[in-house]
Amino acid sequence: NLEGNITIDSLSFLTAPSSFFLKKFKVEATGHSLDRHLAITSDVLNGEVTGAYSFTTIVPSLMQTLKGYIPALINVTQKKQKVMENNFSLLLTIENTEAISNTLKLPFTMLTQGRITGHYNNLYNRFRFEAYLPKFNIGKSMFESGYLTCDNPEDRVNLKLKATNYNAKGLRNYMDLKADAKDNRIQTQISWTNNKERL
């Protein structure tokens, strides 16, 4: 839980045969334990996290929240740790990552600006995260209209994912996945259609 800023400019990544140049990357952290503000500014990732949070306890805190729905999948032997209040919101935008994905051989590439929003409150064990991914690749597969939500408004965790997979020939596969978790049970529904005409 630091306060201050880190600025990096003119950072180059070189791998054969590609390279990536990062003009700027700045992280600025201000505030105190109950009112923090983290701002990220760069060519690839921009955004902010605001509220009360502790970097050392965010993951254990989320695990504790998820344990209420699927305890069999959460490690019950986690070390007991004093968990601070984690009540924050976030907004992140991801720019085109083609250059850095190619250079670092990453399996995921953003082609147009995407956005991630969300909030989490461990005192009430409530969260909601959304991701808007207009156009992206996973490996050589191309996708558009990606939308992901994960939340727990009532007595279960809900996950929804929609995306369209397409190819250069115009074939489109429309995918819709819904899942929810409660009482150590995960229910999943997958829908898959395409625009191919029957012969």
Where are these regions (language model features)?
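Short structural boundary motif marking the start of a folded domain
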Residues: 86-88
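Key residue(s) within conserved catalytic/signature motifs
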Residues: 77-79, 84
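Hydrophobic lipid-interacting interfaces of membrane-associated proteins
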Residues: 1-60, 67-75, 90-199
